[in-house]
C-alpha cells in the first residue's frame, strides 16, 4: 500500500471538535489524539473548516472523526429532539463534508464515539437520543465473528470504556455490526474502509487498533 508521507510520517486528517463557552467558539483536538499520533509517528492534519476538506482529503491517507460533547441534531435522521438541547450543526456539517470527501476517494475512515454516530447518520442510520448506563463506565462487549475487530482482538469479549448517552438505533445499510454490549447496544460498526467504535481506544492507549486498520 502507498502512503502519503512527509519523510517517514503518515498524514492523517482529524476533524476538530467545537466548543462554545460564554459565546466564544473554539475548535480543538484532544491531547489523547496528539499522543496517539506521536506514538505512531503520524502527523495529524486538523480539519476546522469545510472549505479545506477537499484539499486535505487529497493530501492525507486517512480520516479520524473523534468523539464530541455535542449531540447530532435529530433533524439529520428525520426525528424530533426529545431534549431542549442547543445543537451545533456546524460540527456535524464538518463531519459530513469530511466523510463525503474521504469516502469518495476510498480512503480509510475511523469514527470514535460521536464520530461513529456521525458516520451512521451520514449513511442513513438513526440514533437513540438517550440511553441508560453507558456514560462514564466500563463494560464488556461481544465481538462478532468474521469482522475486523475479531481479527484484531482474537477473543470473543473485550472490556471497554463508555462515555456516551446516545447510541445507534437503526444501522445504515452499508455497515455491519462488529460488536455489541450485553444490553444489545451497538458498540462497533464497519465496512471495507470504515470502522466505527462507540468506545475510546485512544483513552485506553490502544493505539495499535488505529494502526492496524489504517495501515492494513
Residue ranges and their predicted role:
Residues 159-165, 189:
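Short catalytic/ligand-gating loop segments at beta-alpha or beta-beta junctions
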Amino acid at each position: 500500500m502507498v502512503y502519503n508521507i512527509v519523510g517517514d510520517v503518515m498524514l492523517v486528517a482529524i476533524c476538530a471538535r467545537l466548543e462554545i463557552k460564554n459565546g466564544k467558539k473554539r475548535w480543538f483536538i484532544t491531547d489523547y489524539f496528539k499522543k496517539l499520533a506521536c506514538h505512531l509517528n503520524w502527523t495529524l492534519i486538523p480539519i476546522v473548516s469545510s472549505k479545506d476538506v477537499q484539499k486535505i482529503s487529497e493530501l492525507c491517507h486517512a480520516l479520524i472523526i473523534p468523539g464530541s460533547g455535542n449531540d447530532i441534531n435529530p433533524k439529520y435522521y428525520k426525528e424530533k429532539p426529545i431534549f431542549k438541547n442547543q445543537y451545533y450543526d456546524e460540527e456535524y456539517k464538518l463531519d459530513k463534508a469530511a466523510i463525503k470527501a474521504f469516502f469518495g476517494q476510498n480512503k480509510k475512515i475511523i469514527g470514535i464515539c460521536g464520530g461513529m454516530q456521525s458516520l451512521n447518520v451520514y449513511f442513513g442510520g438513526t440514533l437513540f437520543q438517550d440511553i441508560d448506563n453507558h456514560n462514564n463506565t466500563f463494560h464488556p462487549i461481544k465481538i462478532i465473528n468474521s469482522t475486523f475487530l475479531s481479527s484484531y482482538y482474537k477473543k470473543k469479549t473485550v472490556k471497554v470504556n463508555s462515555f456516551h448517552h446516545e447510541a445507534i438505533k437503526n444501522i445504515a445499510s452499508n455497515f455491519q455490526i462488529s460488536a455489541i454490549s450485553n444490553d444489545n447496544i451497538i458498540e462497533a460498526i464497519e465496512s471495507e474502509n470504515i470502522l466505527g467504535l462507540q468506545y475510546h481506544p485512544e483513552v485506553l492507549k490502544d493505539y495499535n487498533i488505529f494502526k492496524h486498520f489504517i495501515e492494513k
